[in-house]
């Protein structure tokens, strides 16, 4: 009798494991390259407009509902005005349990961390800082289309995350600020934001503000990564980073965490906000680790 029970338990466990769809890092990397093929996607640029069209086409093909949330930002530091828009896609919007997955789709108009002064006014390509999180979530949308989840998932591509001036946090994360202050959906149970998740040398400690404001969710996600043997995820605490997760809990009281590798590739040699943030610095394997974690989270929620 014990043998039969053990076999039955193993079969049930195997069946549950098979209900989690496989995430393709290869597909996600193609989405990263596609975004970069438009060039820099800083607001107002040709690349921005072409990428917007591409993202809307992808989401309309997979989601139940898709729309944009337009807003305007007046840059008091540098002057000028920007017409920006968050992109919102919902899957199973009538489900009782709802989560939000987000990433910023804009890229920085300046390479202010460039050592070469002549290049500091050039827009960045943003393969990691811009395209990587969006790439993971685009692959997630195709998984949700083919394998409808029991929970509802809202995917938001935030605009204007990277228009900020150093020292003024309020000039960063503009899209998530506007979204949280003008919440266009019922409040989700929690949110997970992705940023800079494509680094070939991916290292993901627990972002410190995430742990401070959503400790239960942070512990749950990193424990899941540990169970899945995803080596990029480090159980130790990392930096405190003002990112798109902060306005979500600050203005909308949504428990939110940020999955981010800020040392790109490491603290002594960083491609962040330079001309070196290009697809060759990223890898399908890194995207796959993050996407695998999210798929197991989505399909494991009861």
Spell out what each predicted region is.
Residues 88, 98-102, 154-157, 189-195, ...:
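Structural recognition of the beta-strand scaffold that forms the well-ordered cores
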Residues 27-34, 50, 54-61, 132-139, ...:
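Extracytoplasmic/secreted proteins, especially bacterial periplasmic and envelope-associated proteins
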Residues 121-216, 237-240, 244-245:
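Acidic/histidine-rich catalytic neighborhood of metal-dependent amide-processing enzymes
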Residues 33, 40-94:
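A non-catalytic alpha/beta surface segment that caps or lines the substrate-entry region
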Residues 19-22, 37-46, 73-78, 120-130, ...:
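Second-shell loop/turn segments in exported
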Residues 1-7:
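Sec-dependent signal peptide recognition
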Residues 12-15:
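C-terminal motif of bacterial Sec signal peptides marking the signal peptidase cleavage site
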Residues 68-70, 74, 81, 199-302:
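Active-site-adjacent substrate-binding region
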């Amino acid at each position: 009798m014990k043998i039969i029970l053990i076999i039955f338990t193993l079969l049930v466990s195997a069946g549950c494991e098979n209900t989690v769809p496989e995430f393709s890092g290869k597909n996600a990397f193609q989405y990263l390259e596609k975004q970069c093929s438009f060039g820099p996607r800083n607001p107002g640029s040709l690349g921005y407009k072409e990428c917007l069209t591409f993202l809307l086409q992808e989401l309309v093909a997979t989601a139940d509902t898709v729309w944009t949330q337009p807003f305007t930002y007046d840059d008091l530091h540098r002057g000028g005005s920007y017409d920006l828009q968050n992109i919102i896609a919902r899957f199973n919007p009538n489900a009782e349990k709802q989560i939000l997955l987000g990433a910023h789709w804009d890229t920085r108009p300046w390479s202010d961390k460039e050592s070469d002064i002549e290049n500091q006014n050039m827009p960045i390509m943003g393969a990691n800082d811009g395209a990587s999180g969006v790439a993971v979530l685009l692959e997630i949308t195709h998984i949700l289309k083919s394998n409808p989840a029991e929970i509802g998932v809202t995917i938001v591509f935030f605009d204007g995350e990277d228009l900020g001036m150093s020292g003024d946090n309020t000039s960063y994360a503009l899209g998530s600020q506007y979204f949280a202050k003008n919440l266009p959906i019922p409040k989700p149970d929690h949110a997970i934001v992705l940023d800079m998740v494509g680094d070939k040398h991916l290292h993901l400690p627990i972002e410190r503000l995430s742990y401070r404001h959503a400790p239960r969710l942070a512990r749950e996600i990193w424990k899941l990564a540990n169970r899945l043997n995803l080596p990029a995820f480090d159980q130790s605490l990392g930096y405190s980073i003002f990112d798109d997760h902060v306005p979500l809990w600050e203005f909308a009281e949504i428990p939110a965490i940020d999955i981010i590798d800020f040392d790109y590739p490491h603290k002594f040699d960083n491609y962040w906000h330079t001309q070196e943030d290009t697809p060759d610095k990223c890898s399908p394997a890194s995207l796959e680790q993050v996407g695998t974690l999210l798929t197991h989270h989505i399909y494991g929620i009861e």
